């Protein structure tokens, strides 16, 4: 299946959603150039959608192995706290970033060992870190919002590069780079093999344990990068709210992308489109002026419609109707030609 055909439902859903938002807020597609940077609601979608898009990259790989990572939100909080603590302590930008990424990799390694070596169910294994992770972040920040004043670090969250927000470049580079790595090498097939049948893949010579651990480490690194972006944007680490419930949006982005929670075949590009759909819904509801208490209800309703339209059964019924309609039309044309 070609990439364009694979992501066609997500592209159509995104286009329809943008059209719907434009009805309520006509200036949604408007772009202006101010101070060398593009500004507008769509640019805001690209920037604000960065955390969920980054989380969705790692979550796609985890779900492809028939797993789940509920700890990505708290990993964001931990890594953001580590980065802010290091920068505020005078470590410098590069050491602070490396320390935050190392914390994310360590969190992923912890999850991977529990799942692949100890044999704990992914839901339970990652729930452990989800439960205690925010407490770890609060210990690092000493229960307060840890602020810093470092222009280089803040650039990662609120800076502009070639007219676009830096966070947008980060999730595009991460997502497209990982997608290319998975499809241009055998890694993608190996990940899918584990998700389809881990035991069979091991018997075929795949080191399923090491690869499974690596997938969770990648998820931790993606969460660390998301935590860095959020922390840099607000110039501070908020252990209580950073990444709060974003693991659910990340899972939803993967599902909207048409990836099965039962593992197997996956598409990172489709998951990125799923993240854009979620952020477009959030931004559209805000700009349309709906009362805040209706936001979650409207969001849930729109997501439900998108998922129903993308469901295999609906797609099958549509293809059946299309084929029967085409056959009927051809039969009528043939009958007219004979007469």
What are these regions (language model features)?
Residues 92-100, 106-111, 115, 163-238:
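Helix-loop-helix "hairpin" substructures at the membrane interface of multi-pass membrane proteins
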Residues 32, 118, 122-184, 211-214, ...:
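Transmembrane helix-bundle core of multi-pass membrane transporters
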Residues 1-23, 177, 196, 203-210, ...:
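Cytosolic-side transmembrane-helix boundaries in multi-pass membrane proteins
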Residues 223, 234, 238-300:
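Transmembrane alpha-helical segments in multi-pass inner-membrane proteins
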Residues 1-54, 90-95, 335-339:
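Membrane-interfacial amphipathic/re-entrant helices at transmembrane-helix boundaries
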